[in-house]
């Protein structure tokens, strides 16, 4: 019997460790710094180790010959014949209109790659590849284009190399590298480029692009095929492959429509009419919620910040990229603008077609069927078309220059039409300073002196009409806020500031209406937050409107034993997440939450969203500890329990699709040695309260029901492993009702997941390059 129990325990340990070993994720990843190599199986690869490649030259007679080099993740020559290694080549040229056209097409007549040519080894990882496609033969090339040795147009050869390998953790991952080589057939220097969007900008949100199976990771490669020739028509095979009435998968069209998502007018119209909106393959993008946060509801959730993508950056190999990034504002065309404004018409049309339903790819008996659908909807007539002339896009810049002289915010310029409130001249700034906190002792009412200014250092009143400012006072006994005796479910004291007394020097003073509990010990905090209102001027589309913008919240720490300020970061609440990293996707964290009052500082969030905080007693009570609900919120559609359901109040986050690899903890967490997300957690981290017990104001472990701290962190993403909670050997998986030891960390996670082991989060959660 003992042998059987030991076997079952060992098997259970193996299964649980396997479940905890990694997260499923999207297509994107982010590079991280490599820690010292671990003692593991010889030849095993770190999960961010990547291949290296370069194109050294291109010669063309009839079939292009590319000279290239392949190296493995250690910089050693890589055999092109290595099992599982995929090597593909692309060749395209820039037309006079600035778009690419591809020489190579697939059987269905769509832009593609060449991979059936001939390789020759030159030694030291250097090879030549001779294309199978004769680009001097119009019957062999896409659309019959041919090559000329005297052509002055820019040509781009590109290489995609990839393979799937096993990492040190035992999981498989894909190594991939995309490289390009620009040249002119006439031998002169390249002067024309199409470097409009650098993949480094994409990777701010996506971590690491990886589409078409994960091997295509650079926008410089994407645009060679995703050009205006890639149009999917209604019918099958050749009859509609270039049909202008089809759905375009040109890069700018596709990317703009995907990111507009549920804010795309065509999607709104199509869904209202009973359709499904824009989609590709089996994926629908009609409900995508763009993550930009703004106090302007017209902009929030919309990719209005064009420079988020259209800016100088680097390609996937770290090379400077983006020479043409300003074309978004310098070259307006009907085609470009209607990728987002897709129901706008520039003529007298009473109906306009928008993309609707998914494009399908159906392999048949020797043929491939591409099909996409459109739906006629009511258009929005462009205000510049006054009806007495045929609108031509050469007129666009007459009304819509790239910029106007002086202030461009909300002007007719291209820049002005894409204004983000918090980056505009309308928002004059909102800055907080806590000058002092007196009487900050248990049983006393703290007296706080503070200042509010704009960006020109002008003093602002906390009682200004339309403004709302407040202080939050909480305390931590060890490393987490507890706020015992202050408010229901771990909430801090709150003090509005409109009644503060002016001191005559631009500062104000207020006394808390409620005293600090006499039982409070440790380190206290006063957090300052608030918003002011601003008026966005009327535009051609919207009437003038008043909106709220919050200033960046700040914190002042003090010793509850002495009342003196605590400036030592080691005694303050630990910093686990950097708001700047959140802003890579969100623009301005919190700008559209809590009436915009709590913005741009996660250290303010945790004063309320602490381990003792819940949604309140009741049947649906759950923790709102920051790590728990933020992990769940971003896991979204990948949650396993309750059919993937996750709601807080009236907000349903069950359909959230995170845009990058969720294993990439450094997307949000600050780095460190060891990383802040590594195990063990800091000493004395509290478990997350899931039920406040009989007394909502008492967070003591004999009253609250908690989930142990490491379990709480892991289950917020790995929510499907709660099936193991019935195994008593795993303290990590046992709910801890009122047990002090369990509630504060009696867990067995470290036996398998401590830093330095293969299944440690800092290794198992390291995303691939």
Where do the protein language model's features map onto the residues?
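Extended surface/linker regions that mediate inter-domain or inter-protein docking
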Residues: 49, 60-331, 342-345, 355, ...
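Acidic/polar, low-complexity intrinsically disordered N-terminal segments immediately downstream
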Residues: 31-73
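Sec-dependent bacterial lipoprotein signal peptides
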Residues: 2-21
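Low-complexity, acidic Ser/Thr/Pro/Gly-rich terminal tails and inter-domain linkers that flank the onset
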Residues: 41-59, 418-441
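Long, compositionally biased, intrinsically disordered segments
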Residues: 29, 33-36, 44, 54, ...
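Bacterial Sec-dependent N-terminal signal peptides
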Residues: 17-45, 49, 387-393, 397, ...
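Cysteine-rich micro-motifs
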Residues: 222-223, 337, 396-397, 603-606, ...
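Repeat-solenoid scaffold signature
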Residues: 25, 343-405, 435, 443-445, ...
């Amino acid at each position: 019997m003992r042998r059987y129990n030991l076997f079952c325990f060992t098997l259970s340990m193996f299964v649980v460790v396997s479940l905890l070993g990694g997260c499923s994720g999207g297509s994107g990843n982010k590079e991280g710094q490599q820690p010292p190599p671990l003692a593991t199986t010889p030849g095993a690869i770190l999960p961010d180790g990547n291949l290296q490649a370069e194109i050294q030259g291109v010669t063309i007679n009839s079939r292009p010959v590319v000279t290239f080099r392949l190296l493995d993740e250690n910089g050693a020559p890589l055999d092109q014949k290595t099992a599982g290694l995929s090597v593909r080549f692309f060749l395209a040229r820039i037309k006079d209109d600035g778009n690419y056209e591809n020489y190579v097409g697939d059987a269905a007549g769509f832009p593609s790659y060449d991979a059936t040519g001939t390789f020759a080894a030159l030694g030291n990882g250097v090879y030549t590849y001779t294309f199978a496609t004769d680009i001097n033969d119009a019957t062999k090339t896409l659309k019959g284009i041919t090559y000329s040795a005297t052509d002055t147009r820019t040509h781009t050869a590109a290489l995609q190399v990839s393979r799937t390998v096993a990492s040190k953790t035992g999981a498989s991952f894909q190594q991939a590298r995309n490289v390009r080589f620009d040249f002119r057939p006439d031998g002169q220097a390249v002067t024309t480029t199409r470097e409009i969007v650098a993949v480094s900008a994409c990777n701010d949100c996506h971590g690491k692009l990886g589409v078409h199976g994960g091997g295509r990771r650079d926008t410089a490669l994407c645009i060679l095929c995703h050009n205006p020739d890639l149009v999917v028509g209604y019918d099958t095979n050749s009859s509609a492959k270039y049909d202008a009435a089809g759905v375009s998968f040109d890069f700018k069209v596709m990317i703009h429509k995907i990111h507009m998502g549920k804010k795309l007018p065509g999607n709104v119209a199509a869904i209202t009419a009973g359709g499904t909106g824009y989609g590709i393959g089996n994926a629908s993008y009609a409900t995508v919620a763009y993550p930009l946060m703004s106090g302007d509801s017209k902009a929030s959730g919309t990719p209005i910040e064009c420079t988020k993508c259209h800016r100088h950056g680097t390609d996937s190999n770290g090379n400077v990229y983006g020479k043409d990034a300003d074309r978004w504002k310098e070259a307006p065309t009907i085609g470009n603008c209607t990728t987002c404004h897709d129901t706008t018409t520039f003529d007298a049309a009473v109906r306009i077609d928008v993309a609707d339903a998914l494009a399908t790819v159906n392999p048949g008996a020797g043929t491939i069927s591409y099909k996409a659908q459109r739906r006629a909807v009511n258009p929005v007539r462009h205000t510049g078309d006054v009806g007495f002339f045929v609108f031509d896009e050469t007129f666009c810049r007459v009304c819509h220059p790239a910029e106007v002289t002086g202030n461009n915010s909300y002007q007719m310029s291209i820049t002005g039409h894409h204004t983000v409130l918090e980056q505009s001249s309308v928002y004059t700034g909102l800055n907080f300073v806590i000058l002092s906190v007196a009487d900050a002792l248990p049983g006393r009412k703290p007296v706080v002196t503070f200042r509010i200014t704009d960006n020109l250092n002008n003093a602002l009143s906390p009682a200004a009409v339309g403004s709302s400012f407040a202080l939050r006072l909480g305390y931590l006994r060890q490393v987490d806020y507890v706020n015992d005796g202050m408010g229901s479910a771990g909430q801090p004291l709150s003090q509005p500031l409109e009644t503060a007394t002016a001191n005559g020097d631009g500062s104000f003073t207020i006394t808390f209406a409620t005293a600090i509990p006499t039982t409070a010990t440790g380190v206290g905090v006063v957090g300052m937050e608030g918003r002011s209102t601003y008026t966005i001027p009327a535009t051609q589309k919207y009437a003038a409107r008043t909106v709220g913008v919050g200033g960046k919240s700040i914190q002042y720490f003090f010793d509850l034993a002495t009342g003196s300020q605590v400036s030592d970061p080691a005694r303050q609440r630990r910093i686990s997440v950097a708001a700047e990293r959140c802003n890579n996707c969100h623009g301005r964290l919190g700008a559209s939450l809590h009436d915009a009052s709590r913005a741009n500082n996660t250290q303010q969030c945790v004063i309320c969203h602490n381990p003792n905080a819940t949604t309140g007693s009741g049947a649906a009570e759950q923790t709102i500890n920051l790590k728990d609900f933020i992990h769940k919120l971003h896991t979204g559609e990948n949650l396993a329990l309750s059919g993937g359901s996750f709601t807080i109040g009236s907000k349903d986050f069950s359909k959230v699709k995170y845009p990058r690899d969720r294993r990439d903890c450094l997307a949000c967490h600050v780095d460190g040695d060891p990383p802040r997300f590594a195990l063990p957690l800091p000493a004395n981290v509290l478990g997350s309260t899931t039920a406040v017990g009989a007394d909502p104001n008492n967070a003591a472990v004999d009253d609250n029901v908690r989930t142990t701290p490491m379990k709480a962190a892991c289950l917020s993403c790995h929510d499907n492993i709660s099936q193991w909670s019935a195994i008593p050997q795993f303290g990590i998986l046992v709910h801890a009702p009122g047990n002090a030891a369990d509630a504060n960390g009696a867990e067995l996670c470290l036996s398998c997941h401590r830093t330095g082991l293969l299944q440690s989060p800092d290794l198992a959660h390291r995303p691939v390059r």
